[in-house]
UniProtKB/Swiss-Prot annotation:
Purpose of the protein: This protein is involved in the repair of mismatches in DNA. It is possible that it carries out the mismatch recognition step. This protein has a weak ATPase activity.
Binding locations of ATP: G607, P608, N609, M610, G611, G612, K613, S614
Naturally occurring in which organism (per UniProt): Neisseria meningitidis serogroup B (strain ATCC BAA-335 / MC58)
UniProt keyword terms in alphabetical order: ATP-binding, DNA damage, DNA repair, DNA-binding, Nucleotide-binding
The organism's place on the tree of life at top rank: Bacteria
Record-given protein name: DNA mismatch repair protein MutS
Gene: mutS
Length: 864
């Protein structure tokens, strides 16, 4: 493309676009942001806006699409959600100031991970950007949130990278554009940077300059040991500087995070427990949506953070528990007060990057005054006392804002009426000139009528022609000589006089000067607030923590959550535990006990489909998770020993992108658990071995259960439909059989959802199929085949003895030749017990009793 063949304006655009080839360029032209060439085509498709043309280049029409300046935020939000980055190119020069096009430059770059504008952000979600820097042994992670000032780093490994990214919920991921960059499960939101930007030396230099220190040891970072983490942090800080066109002043130090701080949860566990997103990708009903009674958006974001980061430090947990207990009698007035608090965290972020608006400062002022008035009773905990002590520290800032900003300023600075009266004498004088113009006009009108004797004379103003004197057509010819004609109308003439012209110049000049002065003063206020940013961030964090703790108190009081106890020995004891989400969705929820300790580490859970096995297992995990956030738990009582990780293998689907079947996904998740679970881990395993042949599945399920018992020794809830596994407690005393009960009523089934000792009597699969609406013919066929299979199994037991030839690890033959016999015996006992349990001898007639006796005899024949 020849530059001589394009206009000066298009040459300017092409020069700017050449510096941002990987981004859409919003090029400001008057009241629109325009896009050209391929940007226009892509934007028109993504935003569903009109694609048009403007002029030609090399004989071809130039594609063009645009969005209005005043509505740009909604379009930016849509592009960012699609993972696009946008360079905002503004007019920075004066129109007509010189030859050629108006001077323009890119003032900021909007990317998914560097947003600060509230219109582009979800109120209750933290927006993070993560940098990933690999070497041969470790992967360095660094992440930041421009909204909160969070800035952290960590060393991890390749096999844990996707789990870390799931925990951080990154909106944008920075990767080196090199061959050794790790492969991620997701490609969305990934930005490739030159590999040299991740160099540790350059990173350390940038970080030490930013924090004003000689080295990074004070942050727990050693130059050699943490080289990749330092490289990631340096690349991240430099990226933020480039996109924001300035170095942010509000990043809250740099801290090194370790695995020992939080209970570990891999990506599958976070997904299966539906902490902040359902399995179908929705935001409700989840643990977060169910517990979120927060009064502020800051509190909601912190609650999500706590749920994804359950603590291991018992002292910190107990401090939160004490605060929750102290607030139980005063959380209602506290939450009422907190509802008036604006999003201080995000306002501080906008101040830091220089794009705060007038009403941001007004909301900040009002919020700081409101926080200083929060009162807590004398019995408050030490944590509450620490949080409350932060608020008075910002009173001087609130007072400065009260003096500087009008009580209700304009939305936009360009409209004026932002700076308070009395803040600046010159501004007050300019406003007086503007605001007292009406008095001058009335006086002038009265004086001119008296001087000329013209009764139709009026002095008025409009935006097109400014100030003027209007006379009717009949009196216009009598106008004095000093009246200069300005406009002719059908029934009137408009004039200007030297006196009125002088006043007009004075008013218009005053208006321009006032707007310019207000902008100057507002920028000065923003600059002064930069020094207050650390205190503002402390206030935001304290208010958010107070909000979450008061929410925990509300849950304890209104939903009967109890304070869990912590033990130093291995135990998970829960009395009448409830699923915190499900109990809010149903009228009646059946509470259940859980007892695991050093003697009983694996609960073998059997029972019918729809019986509640998965709900029960998730319930136990969520109670353990909640206890480690400092929240009280949905139970009558709970005692929990040391927990380091929570693992789940509950349900799965094909991973088509990686060409992995459902069974492969399940086995991969199972393998990860067996490799990483420890004696202090909680493991949930649901129907291991399904998706392959019966014998393969049974063999795998048996092997996994044994591995958990003998090698991992984790606390495990192991749900299965393989009744043959219920022999395990006889071979392993650390295993215990439990089942979810059900009751047959004629041809119908009632799920009791009650955990009871022993194995289940049967699986009730056909009964569940009936509930699902299978045709009667199919149900009858299924029952017929089931009866045949059961009879065949009973007549040919040896064919099911699949473990009789399995060598043990020591090489000797295990004594499990009677494995199936024992399993079937237990199966029969369960069926018989269930049948007897239903009977009420006192209510049976003699004929009914005899009929039941024959039915039981037939039952014995069919199973024996």
């Amino acid at each position: 493309m020849s530059k001589s063949a394009v206009s000066p304006m298009m040459q300017q655009y092409l020069g700017i676009k050449a510096q941002h080839t990987d981004k859409l360029v919003f090029y400001r032209m008057g009241d629109f942001y325009e896009m050209f060439f391929d940007d226009a085509v892509e934007a028109a498709k993504l935003l569903d806006i009109t694609l048009t043309t403007r002029g030609q280049v090399d004989g071809e029409p130039v594609k063009m699409a645009g969005v209005p300046f005043h509505a740009a935020e909604q379009y930016l939000a849509r592009l960012v959600k699609l993972g696009k980055s946008v360079a905002i190119c503004e007019q920075v020069g004066e129109v007509g100031a010189g030859k050629g096009p108006v001077e323009r430059k890119v003032v900021r770059i909007v990317t998914p991970g560097t947003l600060t504008d509230s219109a582009l952000l979800e109120d209750k979600e933290t927006n993070r950007i993560v940098a990933v820097s690999p070497d041969k042994k470790y992967i360095g992670l660094a992440w930041a949130s421009l909204q909160s000032g969070e800035f952290k780093t960590k060393l991890t490994t390749v096999d844990k990278l996707d789990d870390e990214l799931a925990r951080l919920q990154a909106a944008e991921i920075l990767l080196p554009d090199s061959k050794n960059a790790p492969q991620l499960q997701t490609a969305s939101g990934v930005t490739r940077l030159n590999a040299w930007q991740f160099a540790a030396d350059a990173g350390e230099k940038l970080l030490t300059e930013y924090f004003g220190c000689q080295d990074l040891r004070g942050f727990g970072l050693d130059g050699k040991e943490h080289a990749v983490a330092i490289g990631a942090a340096g690349a991240l800080l430099n990226y933020i500087r480039l996109t924001q066109n300035l170095m942010p002043q509000h990043l809250d130090g740099l801290s090194l995070e370790t695995d020992s701080q939080y209970i570990g949860m891999d990506a599958a566990t976070r997904r299966n427990l539906e902490i902040t997103q359902t399995l179908s990708g929705k935001k409700s009903p989840t643990l977060m949506s169910t517990l979120d009674l927060c009064a502020t958006h800051m509190g909601s974001r912190l609650l999500a953070l706590w749920l994804h980061h359950p603590l291991r430090n018992r002292a910190h947990i107990r401090a939160r528990q004490e605060a929750v207990a102290a607030l139980e009698s005063q959380y209602k007035p506290l939450q009422c007060r907190l509802k008036s608090i604006a999003d201080i965290e995000r306002i501080a972020a906008r101040i830091a990057v220089g794009n705060a608006r007038p009403r941001d400062l007004a909301a900040l002022r009002d919020s700081l005054f409101a926080l200083s008035e929060i009162e807590l009773s004398a019995e408050c905990s030490s944590l509450l006392g620490t949080l409350k002590a932060v608020f008075p520290e910002n009173l001087s800032t609130a007072e400065q804002l009260r003096q500087a900003i009008l009580p209700e300023p304009s939305v936009w600075l360009k409209d004026g009426n932002v700076i308070n009266h009395g803040f600046h004498p010159e501004l007050d004088e300019l406003r007086r000139i503007q605001n007292h113009g009406d008095e001058f006009l009335l006086d002038l009108e009265a004086k001119e009528r008296e001087r000329t004797g013209l009764s139709t004379l009026k002095v008025e103003f409009n935006r097109v022609h400014g100030f003027y004197i209007e006379l009717s057509k009949t009196q216009a010819e009598q106008a004095p000589a000093d009246y200069q004609r300005r406009q002719t109308l059908k029934n009137a003439e408009r004039f200007i006089t030297p006196e009125l012209k002088a006043f007009e110049d004075k008013v218009l000049t005053a208006q321009e000067q006032a707007l310019a002065l207000e902008k100057q003063l507002f920028d000065g206020v923003l600059k002064n607030l930069q020094t207050a940013l650390p205190q503002l961030q402390k206030a935001a964090k304290a208010a958010a923590a107070l909000d979450v703790l008061s929410t925990f108190s509300a849950l304890a009081k209104e939903r009967n959550f109890v304070r869990p106890e912590f033990a130093d020995y291995p135990v998970i004891h829960i009395e009448n535990g409830r699923h915190p989400v499900v109990e809010q969705q149903v009228r009646h929820f059946t509470a259940n006990h859980t007892d695991l300790d050093h003697k009983h580490r694996l609960m073998l859970l059997t029972g019918p489909n729809m019986g509640g096995k998965s709900t029960y297992m998730r319930q136990v995990a969520l109670i353990v998770l909640l206890a480690h956030t400092g929240c009280f738990v949905p139970a009558d009582a709970a005692t929990i020993g040391p927990i380091d990780q929570i693992f789940t293998r509950i349900g799965a689907s094909d991973d088509l992108a990686s060409n992995r079947s459902t069974f492969m996904v399940e086995m991969s998740e199972t393998a990860y658990i067996l490799h990483h679970a420890t004696e202090q881990s909680l493991v949930l395993m649901d129907e291991v071995g399904r998706g392959t042949s019966t014998f393969d599945g049974l063999a795998l399920a048996h092997a996994v259960a044994e591995h958990l018992l003998q090698k991992n020794k984790s606390f495990s809830l192991f749900a299965t439909h393989y009744f043959e596994l219920t022999y395990l407690p006889e071979a392993h005393t650390a295993a215990v059989n439990m089942h979810l009960s059900a009751l047959e009523q004629g041809q119908d089934i009632v799920f009791l959802h009650q955990i009871q000792p022993g194995p289940a009597g049967k699986s009730y699969g056909i009964a569940v199929a009936k509930l699902a609406g299978l045709p009667v013919r199919a149900l009858k066929s299924a029952q017929k085949h089931l009866n045949g299979l059961e009879n065949q199994a009973a007549a040919n037991r040896p064919q099911l003895d699949i473990f009789s030839t399995m060598p043990s690890e020591k090489g000797d033959e295990p004594n499990v030749g009677n494995f199936v016999d024992k399993a079937e015996e237990k199966h029969f006992e369960g069926i018989l017990a269930a049948a007897l349990e239903k009977l009420d001898p006192d209510s049976l007639t003699p004929r009914e009793a005899l009929s039941e006796l024959y039915r039981l005899k037939d039952l014995c024949k069919s199973v024996s």
